[in-house]
């Protein structure tokens, strides 16, 4: 801590893409008040943990880091300031202050504008002082703040915040409040600026983007997506996350009709059993989900689909689990985020249902789901061998500096020989091999698109 700048900050970001976007917002707010972003934690006199509360494992990771920072704070004789932001403080304020005395201040997702004031208050009050700003603000969308972005190639643009769905297992309504949408004009202005700055890819973000609605512009998400596509015609456009019950034919047609909107849809289903979906309060049946899949594939024949799955939810039987495996086989998702259920305090499931599936059985069922999905992914990816795909190069491959990795419009990862290319280039690659998670290929031409 001897060389750490007391006005320099470093942000550890956990969890979803929205948290990554929020870290950029916090960075902008702090820099506008004269604070300096440090390139590593050791140089920072202020350390922020931007946290996720969706799963117990994410909370545990934050706890481990706070223990590490406790030791560092002792060595600094209390000069290091530690703040916890994001979903965990909104959800577990008293637990944080009680169990982790290293924490000086807390800020929830709607109160990041208060960060400079919180820091000043703690600095002025001295050792042992704690501050918190955790009020929900149903109007806060951080419009007017230009986020600091870690990439000059790919950008996240939040278009709405919060969620009204109240799925039984989910903490998001408790941590991010009710839905509110960014004004259409503000979204389009940000998109145009990014396109003019040369960004190759823009991802529209929301806990449930399909619920987007700007009452002033009378604009729903399908209409916003079309407008974004036209505002940045040379830029790839993605969006996440969608709720199956809110996928409309108008939205699917918009994707099909605009060539720069990526042909990939992430559509979390969570279980293959309608009975379990009812307990989860998902608002749809498996039959209705499959109707949405059929609609998507009828209008976007080359679409790729991904999903989320939860193994071992309350009351899940072996028959329910087998229904999940059958759904995977029927839909043929490209990929899936797969977890076993862990109850989150204050959620409907934790308060009203019994967590009656033994942990060992949860883990066994999860492993079966993973193995099933890996087989499907490997089969789908092997079918791409011999084809030519357009790839946006994103970064150096983890395994070799002589290779780059990038993604197709369908969100498939491709690793290929560098051949003079660099991140940000768009090129055609012939697929020569595959694994269950990656396509392997060779660039076709020596000039970028």
Curated annotation (Swiss-Prot):
Family matches, as Gene3D superfamilies: Methylthiotransferase, N-terminal domain, tm_1862 like domain
GO molecular function ontology, one term from the record: 4 iron, 4 sulfur cluster binding
Pfam families registered for this protein in UniProt: Radical_SAM, TRAM, UPF0004
UniProt-listed CDD domains: Radical_SAM (cd01335)
UniProt remark on cofactor binding: Binds 2 [4Fe-4S] clusters. One cluster is coordinated with 3 cysteines and an exchangeable S-adenosyl-L-methionine.
Record-listed [4Fe-4S] cluster 2 binding positions: 163, 167, 170
Chief location category: cytoplasm
PROSITE patterns per record: MTTASE_N, MTTASE_RADICAL, RADICAL_SAM, TRAM
Domain MTTase N-terminal: start-end pairs: 7-124
One annotated Gene Ontology cellular component of this protein: cytosol
Keyword vocabulary terms for this entry: 4Fe-4S, Cytoplasm, Iron, Iron-sulfur, Metal-binding, S-adenosyl-L-methionine, Transferase, tRNA processing
Subcellular location: Cytoplasm
InterPro entries per the UniProt record, alphabetical: Elp3/MiaA/NifB-like_rSAM, Methylthiotransferase, Methylthiotransferase_CS, Methylthiotransferase_N, Methylthiotransferase_N_sf, MiaB_methiolase, rSAM, rSAM_horseshoe
Boundaries of every Radical SAM core domain copy: 149-379
Record-listed E.C. numbers: 2.8.4.3
Superkingdom of origin organism: Bacteria
Cofactor(s) recorded in Swiss-Prot or TrEMBL: [4Fe-4S] cluster
Catalytic activity: N(6)-dimethylallyladenosine(37) in tRNA + (sulfur carrier)-SH + AH2 + 2 S-adenosyl-L-methionine = 2-methylsulfanyl-N(6)-dimethylallyladenosine(37) in tRNA + (sulfur carrier)-H + 5'-deoxyadenosine + L-methionine + A + S-adenosyl-L-homocysteine + 2 H(+)
Binding site for [4Fe-4S] cluster 1: 16, 52, 87
Subunit structure: Monomer.
Record-stated family: Belongs to the methylthiotransferase family. MiaB subfamily.
Function comment: Catalyzes the methylthiolation of N6-(dimethylallyl)adenosine (i(6)A), leading to the formation of 2-methylthio-N6-(dimethylallyl)adenosine (ms(2)i(6)A) at position 37 in tRNAs that read codons beginning with uridine.
Name recorded for this polypeptide: tRNA-2-methylthio-N(6)-dimethylallyladenosine synthase
Species lineage: Bacteria, Pseudomonadati, Chlorobiota, Chlorobiia, Chlorobiales
């Amino acid at each position: 801590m001897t060389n750490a700048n007391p006005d320099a900050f470093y942000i550890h970001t956990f969890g979803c893409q929205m948290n990554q976007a929020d870290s950029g917002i916090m960075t902008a707010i702090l820099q506008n008040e004269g604070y300096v972003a440090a390139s590593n934690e050791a140089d920072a006199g202020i350390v922020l943990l931007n946290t996720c509360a969706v799963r117990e494992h994410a909370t545990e990771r934050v706890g481990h880091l706070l223990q590490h920072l406790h030791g560092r704070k002792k060595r600094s004789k209390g000069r290091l300031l530690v703040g916890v932001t994001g979903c965990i403080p909104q959800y577990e304020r008293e637990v944080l202050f009680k169990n982790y005395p290293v924490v000086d201040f807390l800020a929830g997702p709607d109160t990041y504008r208060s960060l400079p004031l919180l820091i000043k208050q703690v600095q002025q009050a001295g050792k042992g002082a704690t501050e918190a700003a955790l009020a929900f603000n149903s109007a806060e969308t951080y419009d007017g703040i230009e986020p600091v972005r870690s990439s000059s190639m790919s950008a996240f643009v939040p278009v709405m915040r919060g969620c009204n769905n109240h799925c039984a297992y989910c903490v998001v309504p408790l941590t991010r409040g009710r839905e509110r949408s960014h004004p259409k004009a503000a979204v389009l202005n940000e998109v145009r600026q990014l396109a003019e700055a040369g960004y190759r890819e823009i991802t529209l973000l929301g806990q449930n983007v399909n619920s987007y609605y700007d009452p002033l512009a009378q604009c729903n998400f399908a209409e916003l997506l079309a407008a974004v596509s036209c505002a940045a015609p040379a830029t790839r456009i993605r969006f996440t996350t969608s709720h199956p019950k809110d996928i409309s034919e108008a939205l699917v047609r918009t994707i099909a009709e605009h060539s720069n909107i990526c042909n990939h849809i992430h559509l979390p289903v969570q279980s293959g059993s309608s009975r379990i979906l009812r307990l989860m309060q998902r608002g749809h049946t498996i039959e209705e989900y499959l109707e949405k899949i059929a609609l998507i594939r009828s209008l976007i024949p080359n679409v790729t689909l991904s999903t989320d799955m939860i193994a071992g939810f309350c009351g899940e039987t072996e028959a329910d689990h087998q229904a999940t495996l059958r759904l995977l086989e029927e839909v043929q998702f490209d990929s899936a985020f797969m977890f076993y259920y862990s109850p989150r305090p204050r959620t409907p499931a934790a308060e009203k249902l019994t967590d009656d599936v033994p942990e060992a059985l949860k883990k066994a069922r999860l492993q079966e789901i993973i193995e099933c999905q890996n087989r499907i992914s490997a089969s789908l990816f092997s079918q791409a061998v011999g084809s030519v795909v357009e790839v946006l190069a994103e970064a150096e491959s983890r395994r070799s500096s002589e290779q780059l990795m990038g993604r197709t419009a369908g969100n498939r990862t491709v690793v290929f020989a560098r051949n003079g290319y660099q991140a940000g280039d768009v090129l055609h690659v012939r697929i020569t091999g595959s694994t269950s998670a990656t396509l392997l290929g060779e660039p076709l031409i020596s000039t970028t698109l």
